A protein has these predicted regions:
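Primary mode marks residue(s) on the alpha4-beta5-alpha5 output face of response regulator receiver
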Residues: 3-7, 22-145
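Bacterial Sec-type N-terminal signal peptides, specifically the leucine/valine-rich hydrophobic h-region
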Residues: 16-19
């Protein structure tokens, strides 16, 4: 699979580039169409908040879909990542307006941790960001990127 960022929604456990932030914007309350800034500190491995910004200003990624994991016992990060990959990749084309495999954007996601799961967090947050990790200056919705 192409490079990806995997984070968790209450305490972010990250693979790839980190997704931590220091604003008062809760990771658990993201909305489709929100644009976010990734932290300057690339060594960060946890997050409970994300810096949100206007999509017309420089930003690192955009929320393009939300999904929910089924209730029950915590399924583990591997199972949640499989679900997130399926959900996010299937929603990518319709939101961005281009095929995921040929897009200049990558799909990344945030998933619940065991701790956030215990607080009823079932959110899977799908993010689009440039493959080269450059900044975006507009929404990726129907952009064809």
């Amino acid at each position: 699979m192409r490079g990806r960022l995997v984070a968790t929604a209450a305490v972010a456990a990250l693979l790839g580039a980190p997704l931590a932030a220091c604003s008062d914007s809760s990771v658990m309350h993201m909305r489709v169409g929100q644009c976010i800034l990734l932290p300057e500190d690339k060594s960060a491995t946890t997050a409970t908040t994300i810096d949100k910004t206007s999509c017309t200003r420089e930003h690192d990624a955009e929320v393009f879909a939300l999904a929910s994991a089924a209730d029950g016992d915590f399924p583990g990060a591997e199972a949640l990542n499989r679900q997130a990959e399926t959900e996010c990749i299937s929603a990518f084309d319709a939101y961005v307006g281009s095929d995921y495999l040929t897009s200049s954007l990558d799909a990344t996601w945030m998933i619940p941790t065991k701790d956030s799961w215990a607080q009823n967090d079932r959110s899977i947050v799908c993010l689009a960001r440039p493959l080269d990790h450059s900044k975006l200056t507009s929404s990726v919705k129907e952009s064809g990127l």
